[in-house]
């Protein structure tokens, strides 16, 4: 699923991965912290397009969500960086390709802060192997444990 199950109060949205009926990853989206908290700023969804022929879902989003900035009981504080971006999820054979395209470069002050966050559901992955960017390992049996090489 891509940007279909959105729960703004719980700050849940983005790319969710479901394999054999079990959610294995969620909240795949751009965030301003590597491990976002409950009251962290989230983007505003502008559009979502499904292209069945190319097996692609494209979602257009923006920061900040001006309707949420500094409002409510626990006000959200958006960083001073306005931009629009697209998250594209494409099925290619037995793989999923996720790409993120921003409408402008990331300012130097946000390098290392603005990141694509994908939260894995650890108990399903404990002890299972992973491969990413020519690296491989085994998921730890504790959520905060070391990843085995």
Kindly give the residue locations of the regions a language model identified:
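Beta-strand-rich N-terminal accessory domains
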Residues: 1-43
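Extended, loop-rich substrate-binding clefts of extracytoplasmic carbohydrate-active enzymes
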Residues: 32-105
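Broad, structure-driven detector of short, well-ordered beta-strand segments within folded domains
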Residues: 1-9, 79-89, 149
